[in-house]
């Protein structure tokens, strides 16, 4: 027997559907069902079925509405009055939903529209997500529009504009509609190109120069076709409108005519194929694991990895840090390095602390040096000029020590007044502070501070002051102060603090780097020193300048060539990814450890697979094998777990979860070392000697066991954890950025000609009180939490401070001192409510 659907199509009769409908009527009255009810339901279904078969034998077509009439009459006949009322209401509700669906679907010829609308009604059954509201707004927008593509865009716009604090899930509904629109357009494009499989798509993209040839070189057709079976299109439902919109606009592969040819899930799979490419054992299993954590939004990779993995130019690393030497060729080499890094989408940190100050001698000529500002302006102009094919200008943070003679002028680089010839508005200044500075500020604000030229110290004393830290640095600093041969620029420390705070309030910068904290905790202090951090202040790794060894003229193939030989120094590279805490079951230690294990493995593979814009980066990366695993969704997970930001419970959570993440990351790196070998300078490191564990007070039996295993097997990665800001990728994951509190629970952003609502993730009556905005949060709670996290993070964190217009300069200063007291290694922006700040996309892992 066949049943006639409402659209006139026949479908096979299924008794189970009748049982489901009757069961729903009974459950609406009594839930759970009484023991005797299932038998009653079976008998009622049999009675309905008997009437249907009689009708069918008589040659009368059986329509779906007739079945519902029979159910209603049968319930009435056997005196199930409450159930009848429920069933009538159910039918009425279904009718209303069907009418709302059809009001929208009739505007489109593709039948998949109706299917998506049905799915939306099933997944969002609450009244505030009724399709009646969507239909009303859509039809109001549509009016005389007949073009189906334009109509679909208006339907999406209607869903987006229905998003509100009281109905935040309209953003998920809008994403479903956006995915439908994208899929329909993509299907048409693929049909024209005669592409019917993932393998055919990769082949076409490769031949078009849009996909790396290395994928098909490393994988057989059978392996790529197996990988295609891993695709889980249902995971597209995890996207919000904002996240899907960003992926489709920025990250899926498009033709040179800007036609998209890749789905979000294929993007994740392509990245997984790239990152697993060099695996020699269980390679396809690693492809699946990488794809799983990416597609389930449990891990986000850095923006360059998301953009460039699987493509011909596969620069996968986020940020680079260079030590600028005190020589003409060295300075220009650093500027050239920055231009190459920027060309391929990386951000840069430049340490200028070795460059001589204004008035220093050059080749014995007194007063000849022009100081660091003219070189910083060169970096500024390079950032503007090398703009990544017009996509965005380069970004560079410039670091200087607080005792450098040029620091007062440096602190005015971006302020609004003063000589514009001394400004560099397109760089991000940052200051490196020793402990002595903050001790003096805290204990004796009336004291003097002595500024000196690093070149002069090197000439007179025979050592570079910046090459020391903590007590040894302090001893040598006072030795230099007392040495009459070294000229000093004396400034009241109060005046220097005033210049810092004035710039911070006006521009949000300079960033702060607490160099003594960073170097005390450096697990590779036996091989060098950390002068500064990177563009987003989360990286803390050994640094040293590139040095020219020789220049020789020789002959190759009968022609004269000039050969330069350089020592590569320690040119820092940041390979970043983030755990999305809100998308991981943190109560399940096995799940957390598995996700961390997969993320660490993927990051370790990035080191061998990335394209290096400069060779010095490749040497350093291969030697230290440094990675930076961080987190996003921090405020989101606090809200999910019912934890107030301003509470001791938050502090306990921060300490506990980061210890677990750290242990899992160390275990993962140690496991890879056992398989592939330890990083180049493991021997003698804090990892090797056990000092890493002792410094952090890791004394439990589990930690002692892990310490012994690390000593035996080594560590694959010299640096492990670093918390990036994740400003872009947190949007993709539908969560909060980094470890910062949210800016607002809800706000409107104008984009593409419409108002885009931005809603705090998982916003509900329960989470609403827990989403206190960043500027309303007592900042000391944020700093205390950061201090507790820092114990478990071998590198640093991108932590912003948020101030209101009510803050005094003294209150801002107190926050800086407090951050130093709790052991933080860096501070990123100070974000005032009256200040617009450009967010960095480079470390958006």
From Swiss-Prot:
Determine the domain of life of the protein's source. Bacteria
- InterPro entries, sorted: ATP-cone_dom, NrdE_NrdA_C, RNR_lg_C, RNR_lsu_N, RNR_R1-su_N, Rrm1
Cysteine pairs forming cystine bridges in this chain are 319-574
Q: What is its EC number?
A: 1.17.4.1
Coiled-coil parts of chain: none
Q: Does the keyword Disulfide bond apply?
A: yes
Instruction: Spell out the GO cellular component terms annotated for this protein, sorted alphabetically and separated by semicolons.
Output: ribonucleoside-diphosphate reductase complex
BP GO annotations: deoxyribonucleotide biosynthetic process
- List, alphabetically, the PROSITE patterns matched: ATP_CONE, RIBORED_LARGE
Using the record's annotation, list all stretches that form the ATP-cone domain.
1-98
User: Where in the chain is the site Interacts with thioredoxin/glutaredoxin?
Assistant: 840, 843
> How's its activity regulated?
Under complex allosteric control mediated by deoxynucleoside triphosphates and ATP binding. The type of nucleotide bound at the specificity site determines substrate preference. It seems probable that ATP makes the enzyme reduce CDP and UDP, dGTP favors ADP reduction and dTTP favors GDP reduction.
Listed binding positions for substrate are 303, 318-319, 347, 534-538, 725-729
Q: Which family does it belong to?
A: Belongs to the ribonucleoside diphosphate reductase large chain family.
Q: What is its quaternary makeup?
A: Tetramer of two alpha and two beta subunits.
Q: What does this protein do?
A: Provides the precursors necessary for DNA synthesis. Catalyzes the biosynthesis of deoxyribonucleotides from the corresponding ribonucleotides.
Identification of the protein by name:
Ribonucleoside-diphosphate reductase subunit alpha
Question: What organism is recorded for this protein?
Answer: Treponema pallidum (strain Nichols)
Q: Which gene encodes it?
A: nrdA
């Amino acid at each position: 027997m066949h049943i006639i659907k409402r659209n006139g199509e026949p479908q096979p009769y299924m008794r189970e559907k009748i049982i489901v409908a009757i069961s729903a009527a009974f459950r609406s009255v009594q839930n759970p069902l009484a023991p005797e009810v299932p038998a009653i339901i079976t008998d009622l279904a049999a009675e309905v079925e008997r009437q249907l078969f009689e009708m069918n034998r008589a040659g009368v077509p059986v329509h779906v509405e007739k079945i519902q009439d029979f159910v209603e009459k049968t319930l009435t006949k056997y005196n199930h009055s409450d159930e009848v009322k429920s069933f009538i209401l159910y039918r009425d509700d279904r009718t209303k939903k069907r009418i709302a669906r059809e009001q929208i679907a009739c505007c489109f010829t593709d039948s998949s529209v109706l299917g998506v609308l049905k799915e939306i009604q099933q997944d969002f059954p609450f009244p505030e997500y009724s399709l009646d509201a969507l239909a009303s707004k859509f039809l109001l927008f549509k009016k005389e529009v007949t073009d189906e593509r334009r109509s679909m865009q208006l339907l999406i716009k209607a869903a987006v504009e229905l998003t509100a604090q009281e109905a935040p899930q309209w953003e998920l509904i809008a994403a479903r509609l956006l995915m439908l629109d994208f899929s329909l357009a993509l299907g048409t494009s693929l049909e024209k190109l005669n592409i019917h499989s993932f393998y055919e798509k990769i082949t076409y993209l490769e031949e078009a120069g849009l996909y790396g040839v290395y994928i098909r070189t490393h994988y057989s057709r059978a392996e790529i076709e197996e990988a295609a079976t891993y695709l889980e299109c249902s995971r597209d439902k995890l996207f919000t409108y904002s996240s899907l919109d960003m992926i489709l606009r920025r990250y899926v592969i498009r033709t040179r005519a800007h036609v998209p040819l890749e789905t979000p899930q294929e993007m994740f799979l392509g990245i997984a194929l790239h990152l697993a490419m060099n695996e020699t054992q269980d390679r396809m299993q690693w492809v699946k694991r990488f794809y799983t954590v990416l597609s389930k939004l449990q891990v986000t990779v850095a923006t360059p990895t998301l953009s460039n993995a699987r493509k011909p130019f596969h620069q996968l690393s986020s940020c680079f840090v260079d030590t600028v030497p005190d020589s003409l060729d060295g300075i220009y080499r650093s500027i050239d390095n920055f231009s190459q890094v920027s060309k391929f989408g990386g951000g840069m940190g430049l340490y200028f602390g070795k460059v001589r100050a204004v008035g220093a001698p050059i080749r014995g000529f007194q007063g000849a040096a022009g100081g660091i500002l003219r070189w910083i302006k060169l970096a500024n102009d390079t950032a503007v000029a090398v703009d990544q094919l017009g996509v965005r200008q380069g970004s560079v943070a410039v670091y200087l020590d607080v005792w450098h003679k040029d620091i007062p002028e440096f602190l005015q680089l971006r302020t609004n007044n003063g000589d514009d010839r001394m400004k560099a508005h397109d760089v991000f200044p940052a200051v490196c502070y020793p402990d002595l500075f903050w001790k003096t500020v805290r204990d004796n604000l009336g004291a003097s501070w002595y500024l000196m030229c690093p070149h002069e110290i090197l000439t007179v004393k025979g050592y570079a002051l910046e090459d020391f830290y903590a007590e040894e640095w302090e001893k040598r600093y006072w030795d230099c102060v007392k040495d009459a041969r070294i000229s000093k620029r004396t400034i009241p420390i109060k005046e220097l603090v005033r210049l810092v705070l004035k710039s911070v309030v006006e521009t949000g910068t300079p960033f702060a780097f607490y160099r003594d904290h960073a170097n005390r905790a450096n697990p590779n202090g036996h091989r060098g020193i950390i002068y500064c951090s990177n563009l987003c202040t989360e990286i803390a790794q050994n640094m040293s300048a590139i040095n020219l060894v020789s220049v020789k003229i020789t002959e190759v193939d009968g022609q004269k060539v000039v050969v330069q030989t350089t020592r590569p120094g320690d040119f820092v590279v940041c390979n970043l990814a983030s755990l999305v805490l809100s998308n991981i079951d943190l109560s399940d230690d096995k799940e957390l450890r598995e996700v961390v294990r997969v993320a660490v493995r993927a990051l370790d593979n990035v080191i061998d697979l990335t394209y290096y814009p400069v060779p010095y980066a490749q040497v350093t990366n291969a030697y230290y094998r440094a990675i930076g695993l961080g987190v996003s969704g921090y405020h989101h997970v606090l809200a999910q777990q019912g934890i107030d930001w301003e509470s001791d419970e938050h502090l306990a959570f921060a300490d506990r979860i980061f210890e677990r993440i750290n242990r899992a990351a160390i275990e993962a790196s140690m496991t890879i070392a056992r398989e592939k070998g330890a990083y180049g300078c493991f021997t003698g490191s804090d990892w090797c000697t056990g000092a890493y564990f002792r410094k952090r007070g890791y004394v439990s039996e589990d930690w002692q066991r892990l310490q012994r295993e690390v000593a035996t097997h080594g560590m694959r990665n010299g640096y492990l954890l670093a918390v990036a800001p994740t400003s872009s990728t947190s949007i993709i994951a539908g969560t909060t950025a980094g470890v910062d509190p949210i800016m607002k629970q809800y706000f409107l952003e104008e984009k593409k000609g419409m108002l885009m609502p931005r809603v705090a993730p998982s916003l509900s009556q329960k989470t609403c009180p827990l989403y206190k905005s960043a500027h309303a949060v007592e900042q000391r709670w944020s700093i205390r939490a950061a201090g507790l996290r820092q114990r478990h993070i071998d590198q640093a964190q991108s932590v912003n401070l948020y101030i209101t217009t009510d803050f005094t300069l003294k209150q801002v200063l107190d926050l800086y001192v407090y951050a130093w007291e709790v052991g933080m290694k860096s501070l990123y922006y100070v974000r005032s409510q009256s200040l617009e700040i450009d967010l960095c996309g480079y470390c958006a892992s």
